[in-house]
Amino acid sequence: MTVAEMERALESLGRQLANRGVSADIVMAGGAWMALVLGAREVTKDIDAYLAPPTGPVHQAIHAVAQALGLAEDGLNDGIKGFFFREPPQTLWREFLGLRVYAVSADYMLALKIYAARGSDTADAVTLIRHLGLRSVEEVLALVEQYVPERLLTVRHRYFAEGCLEEAGAS
């Protein structure tokens, strides 16, 4: 999805919700956050968002928007909820009729990327490390530990952070 497609999908979701007589709050993260909030990329495969309860009406509206705009059924999804270990720091990014879209903070976004530690997250993690001005693996891991339970962090996360720092030119 391009930035324009994501914005159109969110606006359409808000209209769908308003037409159903409901409003909703979502918290955006992932590639959509990198594109829409940070402006660090032009496209992403989907919009990852945490949906505030009740989610039933939101899921119905998402389905209607996906059909109307020809988007994949998971084009806007709440799969990220499994990575929210505590409520993330967030700010209102944009408000549409029927929909308020919040964005996680940059440090929370980096914590998610380091925790996921996927090769596909490297470029985003490098961008976030530079954006946040982090210079050491200790700084990165201390930030991650603010949001991810320490017991879930392994040496893999440290190595991923070290690799990202090196690529960012910070180590």
Where are these regions (language model features)?
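Compositionally biased terminal segments of proteins
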Residues: 1-171
